[in-house]
From Swiss-Prot:
Residues 22-46, 318-328 have a biased composition (Polar residues). SMART domains: HLH (SM00353), ORANGE (SM00511). This is Hairy/enhancer-of-split related with YRPW motif protein 2. The gene is Hey2. It comes from Mus musculus. It holds the Pfam family Hairy_orange. Induction: By activation of the Notch signaling pathway. The lineage of its organism: Eukaryota, Metazoa, Chordata, Craniata, Vertebrata. It is found in: Nucleus. Belongs to the HEY family.
Length: 339
């Protein structure tokens, strides 16, 4: 009876030993224990990696959206459709491609020149205002097309518009030809005597005040060249003093003479284009500079004449007859204020 008890105890001890040994010597126990001990670190690494990946993806999407917003603002066709409906990304990209193709076809001269675009809009707006003034004078005020006040007012406004366009054209030409000093040509106009702005050159009469004339009063021979004055006040620049002399205000023009002739020819071309594009006739509304007057000014400036320029009181018979028929100069405020 003792032997079975010993065997039982020995088997139980062996089972206990095996059980204990199996718990300690299980092959996957070490790995599982290591995983249990390192599981928080591994989880934090995975979460950090996912978080970092999400941040990178968010930044990439934000960069794409910002670029698309800039394209929608810069491309004119997309900017026009911005308020109507929400544009898709594919539409914005397609409009950008079309815009770049247009720029490539036009040689790069597109909407990038903001100053030129603003100048064009200003010129168009001024012309529209001029058309509205002409319509108002004829329809509301009931003035005839041949009324002196209507003719003079429309001629004055058209002169201002043409001078603005010609000044912009000459400034852009001077900027392209002389990038270091784009506005040096303006000195040629600031020092020219007022007599050069007269329709008949250096010859004028004391009894002939300068005023804006219509196309029927100016001879066609004086329409070959146009002097675009860059003065702020056109009326004060076109008026002559009562005396017969002009103050010595012609210093040497040096390099400014090189661009003077080009400026005059460019202004003449601009005036011709404006006359063809607008239904009214503006040929006589511009201050003319004859060729002999331009040559005299160039010679006087090149030789640096020290004595003042004198204006002869006598004039040709044709000019005298024209001067006697002209009205004296009247400020625009007194006439327009009557409305």
């Amino acid at each position: 009876m003792k032997r079975p008890c010993e065997e039982t105890t020995s088997e139980s001890d062996l089972d206990e030993t095996i059980d204990v040994g199996s718990e300690n010597n299980y092959p996957g126990h070490a790995t599982s224990s290591v995983m249990r001990s390192n599981s928080p670190t591994t989880t934090s690494q995975i979460m950090a990696r996912k978080k970092r990946r999400g941040i990178i993806e968010k930044r990439r999407r934000d960069r794409i959206n910002n670029s698309l917003s800039e394209l929608r603002r810069l491309v004119p066709t997309a900017f026009e459709k911005q308020g109507s409906a929400k544009l898709e990304k594919a539409e914005i990209l397609q409009m950008t491609v079309d815009h770049l193709k247009m720029l490539q076809a036009t040689g790069g001269k597109g909407y990038f020149d903001a100053h030129a675009l603003a100048t064009d809009f200003m010129s168009i707006g001024f012309r529209e205002c001029l058309t509205e003034v002409a319509r108002y004078l004829s329809s509301v005020e009931g003035l005839d097309p041949s009324d002196p006040l209507r003719v003079r007012l429309v001629s004055h406004l058209s002169t201002c518009a043409s001078q603005r366009e010609a000044a912009v054209m000459t400034s852009s030409m001077a900027h392209h030809h002389h990038p270091l000093h784009p506005h040096h040509w303006a000195a040629a106009f600031h020092h020219l005597p007022t007599a050069l702005l007269q329709p008949n050159g250096l010859h004028t009469s004391e009894s002939t005040p300068c005023r804006l004339s219509t196309s029927s009063e100016v001879p066609s021979a004086h329409g070959s060249a146009l002097l675009t004055a860059t003065f702020a006040h056109a009326d004060s620049a076109l008026r002559m003093p009562s005396g017969g002399t002009v103050a010595p205000c012609v210093p040497p023009l040096s390099t400014s003479l090189l661009s003077l002739s080009a400026t005059v020819h460019a202004a003449a071309a601009a005036a011709t284009a404006a006359a063809h594009s607008f239904p009214l006739s503006f040929a006589g509304a511009f201050p003319m500079l004859p060729s002999n007057a331009a040559a005299a000014a160039a010679v006087a400036a090149a030789t640096a004449i020290s004595p003042p320029l004198s204006v002869s009181a006598a004039s040709s018979p044709q000019q005298t007859s024209t001067g006697t028929n002209n009205k004296p100069y009247q400020p625009w405020g007194t006439e327009v204020g009557a409305f």
